Each structure stands twice: as C-alpha cells, then as structure tokens.
Amino acid sequence: MNTAICETLFEDMGLTMSKNKIVIKLGGGLITDKSHYKLIREERIQSVCKIISKMIKNDDSVILVHGAGSFGHLEAKKWHLSRGHIKEIIDEQRLAVKNVRNDMIELNNYVVKYLKEFGIEGISHPPSKWANGLGPQFNGDITMLGDEKKDTIQVTFGDVVDVHNEREFGILSGDDLMVRICKEIPGITHCIFLLGDTEGLLTKPPNEEGSELIPLWSNEQEITGSHESSQDVTGGIFLKAESASKIAQNVANVWMIDG
C-alpha cells in the first residue's frame, strides 16, 4: 500500500476537514494472503494504521471493521461452516468453529498491535461474544461501536456466530456489520471499503481483458465476475457492492478503493 497515494485519495474524499465520522473496512485480502493459512501482510496493516492515526489526530472519529482473509475463510471453506450444521461432520465443524473464532481473535490482535504502534488504542468487539444470526438483520446491540474516546477506536470483524435455529452457527460477514453500523450509529459521514489487489469496483475481474474501473456506481449498473469461492466463503465483491448500495441510503460518501 502506497501511503502517499492513500493520503491523496482521502483528500479527494473530503477528509482534510476535521470532525468526520468514518467507518473503514479492511478487506481480508488486503491484510492477509488469502491463499496461505494465517499469513498476514504486515506492511499493509501498518500503512493503514498510520493513516488512521493521522485521521484521529485530525479530530476525526473512526470505527474499524476487518475481514477474515486466510485466518477464517480457508478453515470455514474446508468444513462448510457457511452452510451451518451438517450431521455427518458436525463434530469436526464444531471444532472448526472454535478454531476460526480463536484465529480471528489472533488476527484482530495483530491489527490492534499495529494501531498501538501509532498511538491508537483499539477496543475489540468479537461478534461471537455479542451477536447471533446472519446477514444485516443479525441480532446484536452495536451501540458500543459508536463510543468515542480520545485516541481510541472501536474494532470489530467478520466472525463465526451462533444461529438460534437448526443451522446452529454461521458466518457473519464484516460487510453485513458495515451495513448495520452505518444505518444505526448516528452521524456517519464516510464509509470506506479498502480492497485488496484491485483498484476499486471493476466492470469485470481485474485479470480479464477489458476490465475497467467504475468511478461512480449505482445498483442499476451491471458488474460481472466470478466469486473466488475456494478462498472466500462470504459474498466477495458482489456482497460488497450490495452492502455499499444499502449503506449509501444513509451515508453520502461511500468509497471502494484499492488499499
């Protein structure tokens, strides 16, 4: 991640003025190598944390959500956790649920550690401790994510949560958390999705010929692509676009950019 480029983008977003209230999503593919189990991209996390520290010093407030990347998706894919209870492998699934939750806390600890290096205290809220159910309609009180204290930000992440029906468990995406945060916490001025390995929302996958950046997208505009289900057990770019569309009903500035 090029810090200078990122700062220029934030200027374009109108973030040079203070008193903004910003929700940032760090994509799992940005902060980890999604093809290798539990491999973080340390320099990218540090770069983002540096920018966040500048926002805080600018008297902005920030809520941080991060994805799972290779700390969650690979194990969840192996044991079909997104499908919920499967009788034939339920013992293995329950062990995988425990392991993924622990792995997500480990990844979150990395994020909080790098925030601390830049003088920011991250207060973590693992969804498995306070949320249940799936999609943006999940059950859980998110008001604590709106708490604001000097040099402190609230941090949460995509996680495996309980589901109070025959499914037993499922995956609550960070994108669904973003929708609820931007809808229910008052005063949000900006919502920023920092993506990994793509410059933003494209007309086609970045490796396909003719793929172009969409500078301003509406949900009437078609995007095509393939969801990399071998590495991502949520909705990939399609869920992000859908989530961004919902968020835009409440927040004027919604951005999807290359992290």
Question: Model regions: which residues?
Answer:
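Glycine-rich phosphate/pyrophosphate-binding loops
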Residues: 121-128, 185-202, 251-259
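N-terminal glycine-/serine-/threonine-rich phosphate-binding loop
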Residues: 5-63
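Internal active-site segments that recognize and position negatively charged phosphoryl groups
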Residues: 109-111, 137-203
